[in-house]
Regions:
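Residue-level recognition of tetratricopeptide repeat
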Residues: 54-55, 89, 128-129, 162, ...
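Canonical tetratricopeptide repeat
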Residues: 60-61, 95-96, 131-135, 168, ...
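Structural marker of alpha-solenoid helical repeat scaffolds
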Residues: 50-51, 85, 123-125, 157-158, ...
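N-terminal leader/linker segments that initiate helical-solenoid repeat arrays
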Residues: 18-80, 84-95, 101-112, 119, ...
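Register position in tetratricopeptide repeats
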Residues: 33-34, 68, 95, 102-104, ...
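TPR alpha-solenoid repeat register
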Residues: 58, 92, 130-132, 165, ...
Length: 300
């Protein structure tokens, strides 16, 4: 009976098939918006061909990740595929414009090319779209091209309660090492959209080294808002672990590992936490399974 329970536990973790959680490409977007592009890429690629995936949106974020990694050829291909999937998803046009701004040719000429993409993206009703104007502002900012403030103003005018606007303001302040003011902007984002997952995550990251209790409280608040979010679950587990709350960390990791969008690379952490919690049999069974797939795992 004991062995059967161990086996059930192991299969439960490995497959995630006994869970009510549903895999979704939006988990990848949440990781990207929270500043974790590498994890975002894994999930966006994993869910790309799922029935519920908006491919145009997924390709856009894959393009953004490639841009961050300075793989501009891949970024161009992703934006192109995004437009092929849905020509009306204008963010991919903005991605192409950002690539133009990043060109090494004459700056004046590259700006003219970029402006054509941006003008096309803002045609018709899109002209007053807060998200599209903000994406253009980011394109200017991320390429070091003057002019991002103009599109920030347009974004704010279109929607004064747009949470992504405040998130970007916060990110700019972080780059300027104005962390207190940045947290204020993240709080604004939460105020206008309590479901703004990335705001909770970024806020907690800033505060953890200063006030881990406050950071953990913010993530616990997030659990009530988005209990099925993969990043919310993982961040909660990691925060407990970093704060040496190993029993809570193990429980949080067990919940997270039931999510189809968990990462197999997190399983050694759970095995360690089970050991710390004196759940030796479960820890051993999980460790054996990990080693059967990864004999060189240095943690195990």
């Amino acid at each position: 009976m004991k062995s059967s329970l161990k086996l059930f536990f192991l299969l439960f973790l490995a497959a995630g098939s006994f869970t009510a959680f549903a895999a979704s490409y939006t988990d990848g977007i949440e990781y990207f918006k929270a500043g974790q592009p590498d994890r975002a890429k894994i999930l966006l690629e994993r869910t790309l061909n799922d029935a519920g995936t908006n491919k145009a949106e997924s390709y856009y974020y894959l393009g953004e990740i490639a841009f961050i990694n300075k793989d501009y050829t891949a970024a161009a291909e992703y934006y192109k595929k995004g437009l092929e999937a849905d020509p009306l998803f204008a963010y991919n046009l903005i991605g192409q414009g950002k690539l133009a701004l990043n060109g090494s040719a004459d700056k004046e000429q590259t700006e003219k090319v970029a402006e054509k993409y941006f003008k096309e993206a803002l045609k018709g009703k899109n002209k007053k779209d807060a998200g599209l104007n903000l994406a253009i502002a980011k394109a200017y900012y991320e390429t070091g091209t003057p002019g991002y403030e103009e599109y920030m103003k347009k974004s704010y005018k279109a929607d004064k309660k747009f949470p992504d606007y405040f998130m970007f303001e916060g990110d700019v302040l972080v780059n300027q090492q104005q962390y207190g003011d940045a947290c204020g902007r993240y709080e604004n984002a939460i105020y206008f959209d309590p479901n703004c997952i990335e705001a909770y995550v970024k806020y907690s990251h800033i505060y953890f080294d200063i006030n881990p209790t406050l950071a953990i409280q913010k993530l616990e608040e997030l659990q009530t808002i988005a209990p099925n979010s993969a990043i919310a679950q993982r961040e909660m587990a990691e925060a407990y672990y970093k704060n040496s709350q190993y029993t809570k960390a193990a429980e949080a990791y067990e919940k997270y590992m039931q999510n189809p969008n968990h990462f197999q690379t997190d399983r050694p952490r759970l095995a360690t936490l089970l050991f710390y919690g004196k759940r030796f049999d479960e820890s051993l069974e999980l460790a054996k399974d990990i080693l059967s797939h990864d004999p060189q795992n240095f943690v195990i």
